[in-house]
């Protein structure tokens, strides 16, 4: 019985699918808030909300280890949301997102 309990406890880490997401924001005067999401074991997302009174141009660069970075761009109107997603060929261990926003002209 003791061995069965130890075996069951050893499987618990395998059930965790969450991974850390690190965001490096560079907002440059735009009023954009963000929240991250882990969608699956090989897919991540960032939800952007424009809280300002002017449109914002945003670029998100998703990095997962040695894979090629995925770049997502968009213009977010005032009071609107935008969801940027990226899917990778490998499981994500730690996702790094470089977020750059500026006021649209």
Predicted features along the sequence, with ranges:
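Short, hydrophobic/aromatic beta-strand segments
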Residues: 55-61
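Transition segment at domain starts
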Residues: 16-38
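Sec-dependent N-terminal signal peptides
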Residues: 4-14
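Structural beta-strand segments of beta-rich domains
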Residues: 42-46
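Secreted/extracellular small peptides and ectodomain modules produced from precursors
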Residues: 3-4, 56, 99
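Intrinsically disordered, low-complexity Pro/Gly/Ser/Thr-rich segments with frequent PxxP/GP/PP motifs
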Residues: 65-92
């Amino acid at each position: 019985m003791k061995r069965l309990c130890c075996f069951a406890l050893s499987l618990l880490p395998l059930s965790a699918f969450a991974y850390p997401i690190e965001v490096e924001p560079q907002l440059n005067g735009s009023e954009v808030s963000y929240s991250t999401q882990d969608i699956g074991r090989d897919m991540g997302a960032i939800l952007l909300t424009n809280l300002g009174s002017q449109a914002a141009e945003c670029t998100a660069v998703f990095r997962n280890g040695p894979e090629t970075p995925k770049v997502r761009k968009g213009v977010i109107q005032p009071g609107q949301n935008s969801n940027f997603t990226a899917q990778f060929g490998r499981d994500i261990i730690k996702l790094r997102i470089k977020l750059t926003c500026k006021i649209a002209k």
